[in-house]
Each structure stands twice: as C-alpha cells, then as structure tokens.
C-alpha cells in the first residue's frame, strides 16, 4: 500500500498501490462498518511501602466509556464467501482548501518543540466551534469540521491518556474501540464508510502539499518520492535535490504518485494528531501522505510490517486487499517485495474509498490501490506497531537471561558431553540413540530454568526508553501550557526581563505534564528520566534526552509518574529532606515536565 516511517529514520515501511481494472460490482451500502476476518492468533524495581501507599491513594480514575451516537451494521465475511464490493459512485473530488498559514519547516531549527493546542487548532483553516449557547446553524456562519470539533473537545480533557482514547474513538467511529481491539486488531481488515466528506477536513490537503513545496525545504528521496506502477512494474523517478513545485507537479502530470514521508515534520495538525494517538498505541505512530493522479497507480501490490489505518482525504481510490498467502506472512515482521498480479488470489476486500472513509488492515495483508474515472486521490496512512511483538521482546530478553544464568547457576557452566557430536546434529536427526534423548531433555530443562533469570523489567524499561526516543514531542492543551513553565509570563520589557522568579514551595501541588512524557530507567547503577519534551518532529533528529535522578529522590519520582493525573503536594513527596523535595520538583518544573494545580506567581 504505502510506506511509513521505518526503523531507519524517516518512516515506518508502507506503500500505496493499485492497478487499472474494471469497476467493482455494486453492492448495497447499508453497512457502514465492514470487518473482514483473518484467523485469530494467540498471542521490578523494589519500591518503599510508603510510596506505594501514596500511589494507591492517588490512583487515577478509570476511563469512561463513551457510546457513539451513530447506529451501524457490522458485516463479516468468513470462509470463502463472495468478496465484498462497493458501488463506485460518481461524486466530485474534494476541493483543496486554501492555506491560511505557512506550514512549519522540518529542519532542526523548529521555533518550538512544544506547542499549544489553540495555536495548532488555528492551522486547520476552518471556523472554530461556536461557544455554548450560540447558534451553530446561524446563516453565513461556517461550520467547524468534525476534526476541528474533536480537537477542540480534546483541549478540554485534562488527562492525556483520556485524550488519546477519545481521539482513537473518533477515528474508528462508529466502531467501538473495545470491539475493535478484542475482535479485529491484528486479525481482520475493516472498512468504515461514513458518507461525510468533511470528516477529516483540516488534517491535510493538496493545498498544504503545494504550500510545502513552495516554502519548505522538501527534498526528493528524503521527504518526497515520485513513483508509478505501469505494466506490472514499479518505477521511482526521484530527481536529485529540492522538490520545487515545477518538478513535483511535472512528475504528477506525467502519472507519478507523490508520497510525502513524515508529514508531521511539516504539518502542525498531523503532528498534533499523531502526538495524541501515540499514547493510545504505546508504540511509535508515523504517517505518510499519498497523492495519486487520475487513472493511475503508484505502487505494486505488497504487504507491510505495520498496522495501517488509511484515511481518505480527497478524491476516490479503488482498493484491493488480500489475505496473507500462508501462515508465515501473517503479522509480518518485515515488508514484502513487490508482487505481480499473478502472485495474488482473490481479494477479500475490493472497495472505493471516499473522503471521510477509513480502511484498516493488519501487518501481512497484501494491498494495492488505483485511481479511476478521471479523479485524483489524496490519503494519509497512519502506521504503528512496527517490531512491537512478543518475539521482539523475547529476542531482547533471552540473551540476557542466558548471560545471567551462566553467571549465577553452575548447571549452565557444566561442559557438554565429549561425544555429543556422535549423536547430535542434522545427520543424526532420525537417530534413536538414548544419548540423543537425554541430551534433548537436558536442553529442555535448562531452557525452562531461563525464566527465573529473565530480566523482563529491564527489557521493558529499555523498550520504553526507545519509545520515548521515537515519540513526537507533546502538544500542550491550553491548561497544560498555562500551568507549566511553558506558560509563565516571563518576557523582556522596557529594557529588562519581567515576571521572573516564580518558585515552588512545599505546599505547591503538582503532577507530570502528560502521562507518557517520561520514563525512569536504571542504567549502570544510576537512574535517568528519559523524556519527550525536547524531541524533534523529525524522527531521531535529536539524541535521547534525559535527566539524572538522585537515589534519594527515586521513590518521589516514581510517585509522580504513577499518580498522574492526580496532584501531589511537593511536601508529600517521599524524600529524606525538604531540600530533596524542592530540588526534584523545581528541576522537573524548569524542564517543562511538571505542571502545578494553580499558576505560579512570579516573586
């Protein structure tokens, strides 16, 4: 399908393809959600009791479940039933909206790594929702798009975890998220048809892409790819250097699809969208944008190593999705090479995506896409869960477990039998030698003992540290900005700085800036707090950022991390002295990692 940011740098692997074919047969459009099944697959640090009791008292409330107002039918296709097809309707492509503000650069000199919600909402180019009590349908008043409405709603939700859950609920609506995770995630292709062309309005448009080409340093190969799929072959036609409008649009007119890698580096709204959702997944969330000319296909059939959510923004596109061809391709860990049409069977899903529609499919599902009927297509692919499997976790755990077992248990240091090569190895695989049976039993016993030595928490911390480094910097709500160092009224005025000197006291109530903004990790006998507030919107442009936490402040740091979103008095932090309490809280506040219950007043 498409290509997303990958482990190397710019994107998790993904593509987008299709091929000219006859129109799919029509079918009734009564169902708004279509789920297509794949065979399901099965898949410590010591803390003081005082700190633990405080955390128990400050335990965060559980998320409310929110029912969707929409009523939909859910259709499943199982076994070898006839593949679904959607009616290809003649409808106008979405007009690109005018850009009211120039997109931000992807360079290392971004003016602000942490930006406020209200400032980003202004980039949507649509009217803000009317205040309570006003007349939303007043003649002449532009209506806010569903996207801007939900972003405005998120700005009023104090918990970052609840914001992530709400935005994901909106993305799937009317499909309930709990049903999606329980029955469809990693198992089935899902189509959500909304019949609302404005649903994603303001997220990204062809006008945004044109503005980026004009005003930003967009480079072919690094930020933008030009590709086409003709006569069963994929071609990439990237010239060297900057992707100026004349070159990019000439390639588009020549039938090339344009793939924008890592649009979150340029688009504040895409950044905002992904920065919220990454907390929902607990895994890096990336994206690519694909603009495909009418009557063309940009990419060959293939599968990817990420969970893919396709958001149709403009125009229409015919998609064909195929099951993994054999069990080895289910939940694939690497992306496939390009396939020919002869490699494919019958699609399990054949449908035309319209603006506002959503398509999801798991890793290993082969897909291709093409534009037809003289209409272009613009879609954004959101990707996540690259190399985030049990196998990847165990791949990190087991070598460390073996190393620890060798050091701590003499049974792992005993020598192999002198004659083991006489009955072990491929040439002896059919041997009934009892020595072979004994050898295999010994291996099983030792492997079973490895669980005792497995450093599961240490590996979990390392993966959490990697996720912190992968993450986008946080986008702040108005409340988070006002109550953190980011909103202090310090400024230069009349020849001198004013409003300087705001200080925390033992009575100040604080909590972390957001839920997923930091992680405490032990390394080499020292403690470090890795955080996202100084990350770049460009993948791994910066080295991991961290603060060293003194051992006497470790329990206090853990309390702050675990008690979010409840407030804690600085004087209640489990430290040995008031000095330790204030120094920890002040360091975190000054770094932008902590917010207060009420604004600090400069002295």
UniProtKB/Swiss-Prot annotation:
<keyword id="KW-0007">Acetylation</keyword>
<dbReference type="GO" id="GO:0045668">
    <property type="term" value="P:negative regulation of osteoblast differentiation"/>
</dbReference>
<feature type="binding site">
    <location>
        <position position="367"/>
    </location>
    <ligand>
        <name>Fe cation</name>
    </ligand>
</feature>
<feature type="modified residue" description="Phosphoserine">
    <location>
        <position position="68"/>
    </location>
</feature>
<comment type="similarity">
    <text>Belongs to the ROX family. NO66 subfamily.</text>
</comment>
<dbReference type="GO" id="GO:0140680">
    <property type="term" value="F:histone H3K36me/H3K36me2 demethylase activity"/>
</dbReference>
<feature type="binding site">
    <location>
        <position position="304"/>
    </location>
    <ligand>
        <name>Fe cation</name>
    </ligand>
</feature>
<dbReference type="InterPro" id="IPR049043">
    <property type="entry name" value="RIOX1/NO66-like_C_WH"/>
</dbReference>
<dbReference type="InterPro" id="IPR003347">
    <property type="entry name" value="JmjC_dom"/>
</dbReference>
<comment type="subunit">
    <text>Interacts with SP7/OSX; the interaction is direct. Interacts with PHF19; leading to its recruitment to H3K36me3 sites. Interacts with MYC.</text>
</comment>
<dbReference type="GO" id="GO:0034647">
    <property type="term" value="F:histone H3K4me/H3K4me2/H3K4me3 demethylase activity"/>
</dbReference>
<keyword id="KW-0805">Transcription regulation</keyword>
<dbReference type="GO" id="GO:0005654">
    <property type="term" value="C:nucleoplasm"/>
</dbReference>
<keyword id="KW-0597">Phosphoprotein</keyword>
<keyword id="KW-0539">Nucleus</keyword>
<keyword id="KW-0479">Metal-binding</keyword>
<dbReference type="GO" id="GO:0005634">
    <property type="term" value="C:nucleus"/>
</dbReference>
<dbReference type="GO" id="GO:0005730">
    <property type="term" value="C:nucleolus"/>
</dbReference>
<keyword id="KW-0408">Iron</keyword>
<dbReference type="InterPro" id="IPR039994">
    <property type="entry name" value="NO66-like"/>
</dbReference>
<feature type="domain" description="JmjC">
    <location>
        <begin position="256"/>
        <end position="401"/>
    </location>
</feature>
<keyword id="KW-0156">Chromatin regulator</keyword>
<keyword id="KW-0223">Dioxygenase</keyword>
<dbReference type="GO" id="GO:0016706">
    <property type="term" value="F:2-oxoglutarate-dependent dioxygenase activity"/>
</dbReference>
<dbReference type="GO" id="GO:0140457">
    <property type="term" value="F:protein demethylase activity"/>
</dbReference>
<dbReference type="GO" id="GO:0006338">
    <property type="term" value="P:chromatin remodeling"/>
</dbReference>
<feature type="compositionally biased region" description="Basic residues">
    <location>
        <begin position="14"/>
        <end position="24"/>
    </location>
</feature>
<feature type="modified residue" description="Phosphoserine">
    <location>
        <position position="91"/>
    </location>
</feature>
<feature type="binding site">
    <location>
        <position position="302"/>
    </location>
    <ligand>
        <name>Fe cation</name>
    </ligand>
</feature>
<dbReference type="GO" id="GO:0036139">
    <property type="term" value="F:peptidyl-histidine dioxygenase activity"/>
</dbReference>
<feature type="region of interest" description="Disordered">
    <location>
        <begin position="1"/>
        <end position="144"/>
    </location>
</feature>
<keyword id="KW-0560">Oxidoreductase</keyword>
<feature type="compositionally biased region" description="Low complexity">
    <location>
        <begin position="50"/>
        <end position="60"/>
    </location>
</feature>
<feature type="modified residue" description="N-acetylmethionine">
    <location>
        <position position="1"/>
    </location>
</feature>
<dbReference type="Pfam" id="PF08007">
    <property type="entry name" value="JmjC_2"/>
</dbReference>
<dbReference type="GO" id="GO:0006282">
    <property type="term" value="P:regulation of DNA repair"/>
</dbReference>
<protein>
    <recommendedName>
        <fullName>Ribosomal oxygenase 1</fullName>
        <ecNumber>1.14.11.27</ecNumber>
        <ecNumber>1.14.11.79</ecNumber>
    </recommendedName>
</protein>
<dbReference type="GO" id="GO:0005506">
    <property type="term" value="F:iron ion binding"/>
</dbReference>
<keyword id="KW-0804">Transcription</keyword>
<dbReference type="GO" id="GO:0045892">
    <property type="term" value="P:negative regulation of DNA-templated transcription"/>
</dbReference>
<dbReference type="GO" id="GO:0042254">
    <property type="term" value="P:ribosome biogenesis"/>
</dbReference>
<feature type="compositionally biased region" description="Basic residues">
    <location>
        <begin position="39"/>
        <end position="49"/>
    </location>
</feature>
């Amino acid at each position: 399908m498409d290509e997303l940011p990958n482990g190397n740098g710019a994107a998790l692997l993904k593509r987008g393809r299709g091929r000219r074919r006859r129109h799919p047969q029509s079918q009734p459009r009564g169902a708004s959600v279509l789920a297509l099944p794949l065979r399901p697959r099965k898949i410590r640090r010591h803390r003081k009791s005082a700190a633990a009791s405080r955390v128990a008292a400050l335990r965060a409330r559980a998320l409310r479940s929110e029912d969707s107002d929409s009523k939909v039918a859910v259709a499943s296709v199982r076994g070898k039933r006839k593949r679904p097809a959607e009616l290809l309707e003649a409808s106008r492509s979405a007009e690109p909206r005018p850009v009211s503000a120039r997109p931000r650069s992807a360079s290392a000199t971004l003016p602000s790594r942490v930006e406020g919600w209200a400032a980003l909402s202004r980039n949507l180019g649509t009217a803000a929702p009317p205040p309570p009590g006003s007349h939303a349908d007043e003649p002449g008043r532009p209506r806010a798009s569903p996207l801007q409405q939900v972003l405005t709603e998120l700005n009023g939700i104090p918990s970052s975890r609840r914001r992530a859950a709400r935005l994901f609920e909106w993305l799937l609506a009317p499909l309930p998220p709990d049903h999606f995770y329980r029955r469809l995630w990693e198992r089935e292709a899902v189509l959500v048809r909304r019949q609302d062309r404005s649903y994603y309005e303001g997220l990204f448009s062809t006008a945004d892409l044109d503005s980026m080409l004009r005003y930003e340093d967009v480079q072919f190969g690094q930020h933008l790819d030009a590709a086409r799929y003709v006569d069963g072959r994929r071609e990439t036609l990237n010239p060297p250097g900057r992707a100026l409008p004349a070159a990019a649009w000439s390639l588009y007119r020549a039938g090339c699809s344009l793939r924008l890698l890592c649009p979150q580096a340029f688009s504040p709204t895409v950044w905002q969208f992904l920065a919220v959702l990454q907390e929902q997944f607990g895994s890096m969330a990336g994206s690519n944008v694909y603009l495909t000319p009418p009557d063309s296909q940009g990419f060959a059939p293939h599968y990817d190593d990420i969970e893919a959510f396709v958001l149709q923004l403009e125009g229409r596109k015919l998609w064909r999705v195929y099951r993994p061809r054999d069990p080895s391709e289910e939940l694939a860990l690497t992306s496939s090479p390009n396939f020919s049409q002869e490699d494919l069977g019958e699609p399990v899903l054949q449908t035309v995506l319209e603006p506002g529609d959503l398509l999801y499919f798991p890793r290993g599902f082969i897909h291709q896409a093409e534009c037809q009927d003289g209409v272009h297509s613009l879609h954004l692919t959101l990707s996540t869960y690259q190399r985030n499997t049990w196998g990847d976790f165990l791949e990190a755990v087991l070598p460390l477990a073996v190393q620890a077992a060798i050091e701590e248990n003499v049974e792992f240091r005993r020598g192999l039998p002198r004659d083991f090569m006489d009955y072990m190895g491929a040439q002896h695989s059919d041997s009934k030698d009892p020595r072979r049976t004994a050898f295999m039993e010994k291996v099983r016993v030792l492997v079973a003992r490895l669980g005792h030595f497995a450093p599961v928490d240490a590996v979990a911390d390392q993966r959490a540290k990697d996720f912190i480094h992968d993450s986008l910097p946080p986008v702040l709500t108005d409340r988070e900005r006002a109550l953190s160092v980011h909103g202090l009224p310090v400024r230069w005025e009349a020849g001198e700085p004013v409003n300087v000197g705001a200080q925390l006291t033992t009575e100040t109530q604080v909590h972390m800036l957001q839920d997923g903004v930091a992680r405490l990790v032990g390394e080499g006998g020292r403690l470090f707090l890795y955080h996202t507030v100084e990350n770049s919107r460009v993948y791994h442009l910066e080295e991991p950022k961290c603060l060293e936490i003194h051992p006497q402040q470790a329990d206090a740091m853990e309390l702050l991390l675990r008690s979010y979103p409840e407030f804690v008095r600085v004087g209640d932090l489990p430290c040995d002295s008031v000095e330790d309490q204030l120094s920890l809280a002040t360091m975190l506040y000054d770094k932008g990692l902590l917010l207060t219950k009420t604004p600090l007043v400069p002295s």
